[in-house]
């Protein structure tokens, strides 16, 4: 019994593949370039809207929300100067999942229990602010977060830090 509890508490090392999801038989990953082709591969877009400029140090980055049935993809012109890209070139900065049909790289989906999440990813860190319960896992400049309600996952979010 103690060995099982210790195994559940052990942190799990995340890899780049943990920050990608398969949607419509195509992979979408944080930091990937956003193009007309990736927009089309995601399916029928419900809406696109400018979210705003997000300050980061001496500069700010533009964010757009691309809404699809069951998920959203946020794009930003993050690090365009550092990577010597055009100011109007965008990368995937956030992916939010709201339906059980889209699973994480390790198979976790909306509706799964907190116990299944912990068995798969470890304890992670918790945040109970604003009346919400989140469990998150981070590596370098990326975060994978799960919102839980009544012990079940109701929302999955992958984010890329603005400093990346």
Where are these regions (language model features)?
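N-terminal low-complexity, Pro/Thr/Ser-rich intrinsically disordered segments
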Residues: 2-35
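Second-shell loop/turn segments in exported
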Residues: 23-28, 100-108
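A short, hydrophobic secondary-structure junction motif
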Residues: 70-73, 98-102
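A cross-family detector of function-defining hotspots
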Residues: 9, 34-84, 108-152, 158-164
């Amino acid at each position: 019994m103690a060995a099982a509890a210790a195994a559940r508490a052990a942190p799990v090392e995340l890899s780049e593949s943990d920050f990608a999801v398969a949607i419509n038989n195509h992979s979408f990953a944080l930091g990937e370039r956003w193009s007309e082709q990736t927009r089309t591969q995601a399916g029928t877009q419900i809406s696109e809207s400018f979210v705003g400029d997000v300050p980061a140090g001496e500069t700010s980055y533009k964010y757009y929300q691309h809404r699809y049935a069951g998920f959203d993809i946020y794009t930003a012109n993050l690090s365009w100067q550092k990577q010597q890209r055009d100011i109007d070139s965008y990368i995937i900065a956030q992916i939010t999942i709201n339906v059980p049909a889209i699973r994480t790289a390790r198979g976790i989906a909306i509706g799964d229990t907190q116990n299944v999440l912990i068995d798969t990813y470890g304890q992670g860190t918790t945040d109970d602010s604003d009346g919400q319960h989140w469990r998150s896992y981070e590596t370098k400049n990326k975060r994978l977060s799960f919102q839980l309600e009544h012990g079940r996952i109701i929302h999955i979010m992958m984010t890329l830090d603005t400093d990346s």
